[in-house]
Amino acid sequence: MAVDTHVDTIVRGGKVVTSSQVMDAAVAIKGEKIAAVGPEHLLPKADRYIDAEGKFVLPGLIDSHVHLDGHDDYALGALAAAHAGLTTLVPFGNYALEGDETLEQAVRRIQDEVGTAALVDFGFHFILQNRPSILASLPRAMELGVKSFKMFMTYKKRPGRMCDDDYICNAMDMVAKGGGVLQLHCESGNIIEYLENK
């Protein structure tokens, strides 16, 4: 592997936190990626140096389960995340309450809402509602960058939430073909409804 002879930034003097240890080290950054971690004298020269003396240095943190519908919007959520040291949020994408908004339409609307107000990076995780228009627009939503989805075999009393086996299998095939991931709540909606009514 080639070693960079020059990087954009070096963060020095702090305690670097990795997944396995905390150590005195410097971090070399090129573009938006960590190029090297180690003693400063072994790192390439940089255009900019940041003094982290007395501080902990961590890579950007990711919150992969965020709800930003209701009181919080994307701008406020991003501001709170940045203050907390998060650099990426993966909120649940939501559908318009009126009409039959497709998954593609929801993705485009949310991309517009995030727009330039975002101080952090965003990814999205969508619940695949039990509506033909959602499944039909799934491949296009994946082409637009959404790769994480959730489905439910329960919540029978919530419109469009509970999915039958055929719908789930079709969605799983489509998500796999597009290189995505799908989380499934596997409780039995019929048994839960029976127990709720008992």
Where are the model-predicted features located?
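Histidine-rich, glycine-flanked metal-binding segment
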Residues: 2-58
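Divalent metal-coordination and catalytic microenvironments
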Residues: 14, 27, 32, 54, ...
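Conserved protein kinase catalytic core
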Residues: 19, 59, 69-71, 97, ...
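Short, well-ordered amphipathic alpha-helical segments that serve as non-catalytic structural scaffolds
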Residues: 41, 77-80
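Redox-cofactor binding/interface segments in oxidoreductases and associated redox assembly factors
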Residues: 51, 63, 69, 91, ...
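Di-metal (Zn2+ and/or Mg2+/Mn2+) metal-binding site signature of metallo-dependent hydrolases
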Residues: 55-78
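Divalent-metal coordination cores built from histidine and acidic residues
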Residues: 79-195
